[in-house]
Design a protein with these regions (language model features):
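Flexible gly/pro-rich beta->alpha loop and the following alpha-helix that scaffold active-site loops
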Residues: 4-9, 14-80, 84-85, 91, ...
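Pocket-forming structural segment of enzyme catalytic cores
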Residues: 64-80, 85-179
Length: 201
C-alpha cells in the first residue's frame, strides 16, 4: 500500500509487535514491521514510529541492534515497555532493576495533560509486564502517568512529539488501550484509509 499513510513498528523481539500492528490496522491505518536497526531513510515516509516491547533488558549484551538516529527523526515516536526504557536511557534517564517489577493489571494515574489521554479516564486499568523500570527522568521529558506502585509509567517530551509507556496499550487488559493508540494515530496525522478488503484487492 505505497500510497497510503502508514506507521512503522520496530520489533525488539516482543510477542506483541504483530499485535501492535494489528491494533493500528484495525484503526484503519496501514502498519509495517521493521527491525530496529533499519536505516532512517526507510522510515522517512512513515507518519509515526512505535518501538515495541521486548524480552531483553536494555543493559543486556545481546539486545537487538538499534539505530539511535531513529530517535532524531521528526515524526511522532511512541515507545512501549522495552521501547519506553530504551528511549529513557537514550535521552539520559536512568533505568534499573529495582526489584519491584510489575506483572499484571495496574491502575494508571494521569499526572499531566497529554494528547495520549484524550477520552481516557484517570485511574484506568493497564497491563504491565516488566522487571526493569525508569528511575530517573531523561532530559526534556515529563512524567504524564504513574502507577500506584510509583512506577514512571508514561513520559512525554516537552518540545518534541516523543512519548513512552511502560505498559502495553495493545493488549485488551489495558482497558483504554485502543483509545490511546487511536490518539497516537491522530497526533501522527495518519489518514485512516487502509482495510483488509483494499489490501486483498
Amino acid at each position: 500500500m505505497p500510497n497510503d499513510d502508514f506507521l512503522a513498528v520496530l520489533d525488539f523481539g516482543s510477542q506483541y509487535a504483530h499485535l501492535i500492528a494489528k491494533r493500528i490496522r484495525h484503526l484503519g491505518v496501514y502498519t509495517e514491521i521493521f527491525p530496529p536497526s533499519i536505516d532512517t531513510d526507510r522510515l522517512e515516509a512513515a507518519k509515526g514510529i512505535i518501538l515495541s516491547g521486548g524480552p531483553a533488558s536494555v543493559f543486556a549484551e545481546d539486545v537487538p541492534a538499534f539505530n539511535p538516529e531513529i530517535l532524531n527523526l521528526s515524526q511522532p515516536i511512541l515507545g512501549l515497555c522495552y521501547g519506553h526504557q530504551l528511549m529513557a536511557k537514550h535521552f539520559g534517564g536512568s533505568v534499573a532493576n529495582t526489584g519491584q517489577g510489575e506483572f499484571g493489571k495496574a491502575s494508571l494515574r494521569q499526572l499531566n495533560p497529554s494528547l495520549l489521554w484524550k477520552d481516557v479516564a484517570d485511574n484506568s486499568q493497564v497491563w504491565m509486564s516488566h522487571q526493569d523500570s525508569v528511575t530517573e527522568l531523561p532530559q526534556g521529558f515529563q512524567v504524564i502517568g504513574e502507577t500506584i506502585a510509583g512506577s514512571l509509567a508514561a513520559l512525554q517530551h516537552q518540545e518534541r512529539p516523543l512519548f513512552s509507556l511502560q505498559f502495553h496499550p495493545e493488549v485488551t487488559d489495558t482497558l483504554a488501550g485502543t483509545q490511546i493508540l487511536s490518539n497516537f494515530v491522530e497526533l501522527c496525522k495518519a489518514h485512516p484509509s487502509w482495510s483488509m478488503e483494499r489490501f486483498i484487492e
